Amino acid sequence: MTKTSLITTIAVVCSLTFLGTVGDSQDKPIKKDLKLAFVPKNVNNPYNVIETKGSLDACQEIGAQGKVVGPSDASASSQVSYINTLITQRQNAIVLAANDPNALIPYLKRAREQKIQIVTMDSDTAPEGRKVFINQASSEGIGQGQVQILAKQIDFKGEIAILSATPNATNQNTWIKYMEEELQKPEYKDMKLVRIAYGNDEDQKSFTETQGLLEAYPNLKGIISPTTVGVAAAARYLSTSPLKGKIALVGLGTPNQMRQFVKDGTVKEFALWNPSDVGYLAAYAAAQLASGNIEGKEGETFSAGKLGSRTIGKDGVVILGPLTVFDAANIDQFNF
């Protein structure tokens, strides 16, 4: 992946540097035939398909039995029945992208009481619900970076909106918090956040919400959509609109979803990490926990296959790495 443009504000040192004298699992083998289950936010989201494919690839490498189960809608209540079934099946570990930070805690605690290891990826629960959280990148950097990209495109002036996923999505709300903090800085004094809309990580609703934003705010200059479903739906709407090229759209998208919109001029830049690597890293963390090689404590290190040695940071967080910014110059170098 040459010539990638990285947002430099994202600190990844904490995921790569040994933080203490806690145990090192580097030379400890992973148990064979572990049962690892992966519960994405929803199973029909293209991003989640890529993410869990990475998880299953890791399972194949380490000789684990991996499976993906989950709801078709991105709600916490819909994830509960799957978690309960996996507890009954006595999985060794459950890897979860949470649709709510708190609603799933009682069920995850029940799983942990049954000695099932819990790892969250992509979207976290409160720390008491799991041992390790695989974070895509620094949450602060993700939020700040999207504001910075948009601000440059609109010359730091004008009304902007955010098109999010669901109102309770942990990762979305954390990133939005950092966006709002970034917008308080003096350089953004001429920018105004007029609305946060929610497309519920559904393509058609996100498409309709984009239309609604543009109708409600005729002076809108830009939209940030920190969800792969939302940013692709917004781009699809703008691509056939008279506002194509006049409204700046940035957010988090996959290159394969966004390629046509970059090439036709609808979108100049967007950002993401490799979702497959998120799932891959989460599977290795789950397997190391289930093997008794790590406990999720700050400073522990573990081997994560092709991703090398990783260190657990504060509150059990492991950061994958920095964001990559995609544009017309580099998008064809990526295929996911």
Where are these regions (language model features)?
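Bacterial N-terminal signal peptides that target proteins for export
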Residues: M1-I10
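Bacterial N-terminal signal peptides
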Residues: T9-F18
